[in-house]
Amino acid sequence: MNYLAVLVGGGVGALVRYLVSIFIQKFVPNFPLGTMVINTTGAFLIGFLSIYLTEVIDAPPNIRLLLITGFLGGYTTFSTFTLEGIGLINNGDYLKAFYYIVGTNVIGFLFVALGRFLGGLL
């Protein structure tokens, strides 16, 4: 059952990542904003769910596997983030690379903290 939870969650997470990314890239084609939004919202969600599912509602392990390991594992894109960051550097877009790399990390840390805080309020 645990394997199925991770499989289903990962598939749905990957699909949502793809849909969000192509939607955002239509509006901001020259900056990897889609990946940045996905990684930062994923950071928020993992912070929120890590508290909410364990301390607020005490969700069963298979639900935690479905949402955190599965969905968020498929949804977040750290490997894509690093590849796109290197691509910006290789193209000589150093300022964009700086904003992208630093912005994703700073916002990611802040969103994990915010998610944990809000998850604890419920």
From Swiss-Prot:
Annotated catalysed reactions: fluoride(in) = fluoride(out)
Q: Where in the cell is it found?
A: Cell inner membrane
Tell me, in one coarse class, where this protein mainly resides.
membrane
Control of this protein's activity: Na(+) is not transported, but it plays an essential structural role and its presence is essential for fluoride channel function.
One GO molecular-function annotation for this sequence? fluoride channel activity
Q: Does the keyword Transport apply?
A: yes
Q: What does this protein do?
A: Fluoride-specific ion channel. Important for reducing fluoride concentration in the cell, thus reducing its toxicity.
Q: Which HAMAP family match?
A: FluC
Q: Give the family from UniProt.
A: Belongs to the fluoride channel Fluc/FEX (TC 1.A.43) family.
Q: What is this protein called?
A: Fluoride-specific ion channel FluC
Q: Which species does the entry assign this protein to?
A: Hydrogenobaculum sp. (strain Y04AAS1)
* Originating gene: fluC
